[in-house]
C-alpha cells in the first residue's frame, strides 16, 4: 500500500515545508501562460494539498454511498491523472472509462500504457459505433468538422457523445475533472449537479483546484501524464482538433481553435445546471 493512501483513513503527512525542488510548472507570467523552471514544492505534498486531496476522496466516497453505481469519464488530461490516482488507490468502487475517438494523439495511447504499468489496472475504452462513423465520414469527409460548427458537433456526437451515453448507461452518477479556471462556461459549475441531459448526477470534485495544484499533485505522486503537456498543450483532445496554445491565450484556446470560445465544448458538459448540494 502506498504510504499515506490507506483505505479511507486520514492521509499521513507526506509534505515537508522545508523541502523545495525545481520543477516545470505551468504558470501565468508576463500576461501569458508558459512553462518556466519554478521554485516550488514539486516533489512533496503540502498540507494544503493533502487536505484538498482528502476532500476529493471524501466527496467521491460520499457519491458512492449516496448514489451507488458511480463511473468516472476519464479525459486522460492532467486533472484526470489526479482523479485516476485517488480513485484507483482509495475509492476503487468507482469504475473508469475513456473514449477512444479513433483520432487521439499517439502520446495519449502511450499514456494509457504507462497508467496500466503504474497501477496494474486498465481503463476501459469505449469506441464510436462503426456504422454511425461510416455514415459521418461518407457525409462530411474525414476532416469535414473544419467546415462548420454543425459539422464539428456532428463529429463530436458520433465520436464522443454517443459512446459516452453508452458508457454511463446504468450508472447513477458520473465524475468529471472540470475546473472553474478552465473556461467561462466551466466557471459556473457546481460540485454536484443533476445532469438532466443524461439523466444522472454529475460530480466535479476538482472544481476549485488551481492548475498549479493539479501539477504539484502529479509531481509529488510521480503520476504519469501526457507528454504533450510539456509542449504547451494544457487541454488535449483529438489530434486534428487540438493545438499548442500561445502566450496570453486561455488554456482551452487550443481546442477547436477556429471556433468562438463559447462554442469550444464537445457536448459532454451539459450547459443547463441544477445544483443539488454536496455529494
Give the location of each predicted region.
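Nucleotide-activated chemistry modules centered on ATP-dependent adenylation/adenylyltransferase
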Residues: 2-18, 24-26, 36-279
Amino acid at each position: 500500500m502506498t504510504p499515506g493512501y490507506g483505505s479511507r483513513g486520514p492521509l499521513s503527512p507526506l509534505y515537508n515545508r522545508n523541502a523545495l525542488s525545481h520543477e516545470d510548472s505551468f504558470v501565468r507570467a508576463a500576461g501569458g501562460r508558459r512553462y518556466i523552471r519554478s521554485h516550488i514544492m514539486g516533489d512533496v505534498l503540502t498540507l494544503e494539498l493533502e487536505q484538498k486531496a482528502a476532500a476529493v476522496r471524501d466527496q467521491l466516497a460520499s457519491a458512492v454511498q449516496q448514489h451507488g453505481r458511480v463511473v468516472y469519464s476519464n479525459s486522460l488530461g492532467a486533472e484526470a491523472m489526479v482523479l485516476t490516482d485517488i480513485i484507483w488507490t482509495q475509492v476503487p468502487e468507482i469504475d473508469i472509462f475513456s473514449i477512444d475517438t479513433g483520432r487521439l494523439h499517439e502520446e495519449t495511447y502511450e499514456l494509457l500504457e504507462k497508467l496500466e504499468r503504474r497501477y496494474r489496472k486498465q481503463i476501459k475504452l469505449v469506441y464510436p459505433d462503426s456504422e454511425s462513423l461510416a455514415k459521418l465520414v461518407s457525409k462530411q469527409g474525414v476532416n469535414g468538422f473544419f467546415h462548420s460548427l454543425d459539422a464539428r458537433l456532428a463529429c463530436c456526437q458520433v465520436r464522443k457523445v454517443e459512446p459516452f451515453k453508452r458508457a454511463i448507461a446504468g450508472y447513477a452518477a458520473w465524475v468529471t475533472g472540470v475546473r472553474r479556471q478552465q473556461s467561462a462556461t466551466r466557471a459556473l459549475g457546481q460540485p454536484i449537479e443533476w445532469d438532466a441531459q443524461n439523466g444522472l448526477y454529475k460530480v466535479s470534485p476538482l472544481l476549485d483546484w488551481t492548475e498549479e495544484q493539479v501539477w504539484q499533485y502529479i509531481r509529488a505522486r510521480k503520476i504519469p501524464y501526457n507528454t504533450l503537456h510539456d509542449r504547451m498543450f494544457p487541454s488535449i483532445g483529438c489530434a486534428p482538433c487540438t493545438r499548442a496554445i500561445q502566450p496570453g491565450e486561455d488554456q482551452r484556446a487550443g481546442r477547436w481553435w477556429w471556433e468562438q470560445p463559447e462554442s469550444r465544448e464537445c457536448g459532454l458538459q451539459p450547459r443547463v445546471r441544477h445544483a443539488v448540494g454536496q455529494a
